[in-house]
């Protein structure tokens, strides 16, 4: 994800 610093994958 470009430009995002809070990507959560569960």
UniProtKB/Swiss-Prot annotation:
One of its GO terms (cellular component) is extracellular region. Its EC number is 3.4.21.-. It is found in: Secreted. Keywords: Blood coagulation cascade activating toxin, Disulfide bond, Glycoprotein, Hemostasis impairing toxin, Hydrolase, Protease, Secreted, Serine protease, Toxin. Glycosylated. One of its GO terms (molecular function) is toxin activity. It comes from the Eukaryota. This is Thrombin-like enzyme D-V.
């Amino acid at each position: 994800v470009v430009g995002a610093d809070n990507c959560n994958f569960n």
